[in-house]
Amino acid sequence: HDPERLGAKESGITDYLIYDNYRRASLLDHFFDYNIRLDELMRSEYEEKGDFIGSPYLLERINERQALGVRLSREGLASGNNVKIDKSVSFRKSGIRVDYLIEGRHSGIFATEFNLSFLGSPYPSIHAGGKALFMKDKGAHSGVKSFYIKDEFLNMKLEFSFDEKVDVWHYPIETVSLSEGGVERLYQGTAFLFMKKIDFNGNKRLGFNVSFGEVK
């Protein structure tokens, strides 16, 4: 069907008809070229250099004294080189701890993707790099050691803190739907990518914390 003929609520809405290449989950592992652009990610017009997206990982339960967790591991390829990813996720009262160990050889960008939604509301604010943006905004922040998302309505604050500086990119995930009023865009959530330029032959460690709290 032609959305324009069905009564589109905005012109050019067909530009937003983009089909995802994978399921929108979290802790998704990407390998990109150095020259990847945010708009290419938004439109799914980029080349994935690794084969980890959509592939199964080996799952192992971790029993720690102060937390429960899981370890996920997989051997795959990145730019034609053998790479192994080991990631552990520990669940604590204060939040989540994520640790990565990447072994092999790669020159480019490694990115971890999170997809978040606060009851489908586009109005919680993202505070990163001295800027405040809405969840429905796109943004790219360089050299970030920590950032947080604040939802006044839910009285909730979600903070990410990294062991070393990363670039944080985010953009809205929207669907194009037909309602009684016509064809329109509907906000579903926001994709966050934690980007790290890496050039190694051996191993690389990365880690971050996710903490939960109230708005103060």
What are these regions (language model features)?
Residues F31, N35, E40-R105, K145-K216:
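Beta-strand-rich recognition/accessory modules
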Residues E103-D167:
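Polysaccharide-binding surfaces and accessory modules of carbohydrate-active proteins
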